[in-house]
């Protein structure tokens, strides 16, 4: 079994960046504490993850499975980098995409009650190298549920790439194969990560403020 790819570890006392140093939509000005991971850093890290993925999975047809909705930005950017590597390689491989939607959050807590929406026919995964792309691993329960579903279809290989992984006492111990950033136990939004469907339109990963939580609470 291949070793997991290393990640960028962000410490518990990471101060982040002042909002005034970046372009933040005015309608979120009072709803955020700080910029936690700037967009440019996300993109550079994603480019390296693409290389790690191709090194480990690039010998066979890859099915990239996007976990909606939060994973769509990371998924699109990661696949752009993978496709660039693929078309410039002497040993390019076919790649197809599929989508599944999971829901496990109410407000800022993972409920543990995981709903699978879509993915009714995942028979196309049989015999393929499957790359599941997720925005964030919190407790890990959601991904364990999805992995059990995917493995029923007997793929050749299953790997998980997540932009973020939280250090949290609620974790069940699951760790993905490819991680962009390991972060403290803070509720983050932006770059398609949401709080009750808000904040997906932020370019950066930011820490939500108590004002923001109260304003957009379900």
From Swiss-Prot:
Looking at the UniProt record for this protein, which Gene Ontology cellular component terms does it annotate, in alphabetical order? cytoplasm; cytosol
Binding annotation for Mg(2+): 194
- Give the enzyme's main class according to its UniProt record, as a single word: transferase
Residues annotated as binding GMP: 69, 134-142, 166, 186-188, 194
Q: Where is this cross-link: Glycyl lysine isopeptide (Lys-Gly) (interchain with G-Cter in SUMO1)?
A: 115
Do you know which InterPro entries this protein is assigned to? HGPRT (IPR050408), Hxn_phspho_trans (IPR005904), PRibTrfase_dom (IPR000836), PRTase-like (IPR029057)
What keywords are assigned to this protein?
Acetylation, Cytoplasm, Glycosyltransferase, Isopeptide bond, Magnesium, Metal-binding, Nucleotide-binding, Phosphoprotein, Purine salvage, Transferase, Ubl conjugation
Query: What are the Phosphothreonine sites (modified residues) in this protein?
Result: 142
The active site is formed by 138
- Tell me the residues linked by Glycyl lysine isopeptide (Lys-Gly) (interchain with G-Cter in SUMO2): 115
Gene Ontology terms describing biological process:
GMP catabolic process; GMP salvage; guanine salvage; hypoxanthine metabolic process; hypoxanthine salvage; IMP metabolic process; IMP salvage; positive regulation of dopamine metabolic process
| PROSITE patterns (UniProt xref) | PUR_PYR_PR_TRANSFER (PS00103)
Q: Name one Pfam family in it.
A: Pribosyltran
Question: How is the cofactor bound, as the UniProt entry phrases it?
Answer: Binds 2 magnesium ions per subunit. The magnesium ions are essentially bound to the substrate and have few direct interactions with the protein.
For whether the record's keyword set contains Ubl conjugation, the answer is: yes
Whether Glycosyltransferase counts among this entry's keywords is yes
What EC number(s) has UniProt assigned to this enzyme? 2.4.2.8
Residue positions where N-acetylalanine is found in the record:
2
Positions carrying N6-acetyllysine:
103
SUPFAM superfamilies per record: PRTase-like
Any GO MF annotation of the entry:
nucleotide binding
Alphabetized NCBIfam families for the sequence:
HGPRTase
Function text: Converts guanine to guanosine monophosphate, and hypoxanthine to inosine monophosphate. Transfers the 5-phosphoribosyl group from 5-phosphoribosylpyrophosphate onto the purine. Plays a central role in the generation of purine nucleotides through the purine salvage pathway.
> What's the name of the protein?
Hypoxanthine-guanine phosphoribosyltransferase
| Lineage of producing organism | Eukaryota, Metazoa, Chordata, Craniata, Vertebrata
Gene that produces this protein: HPRT1
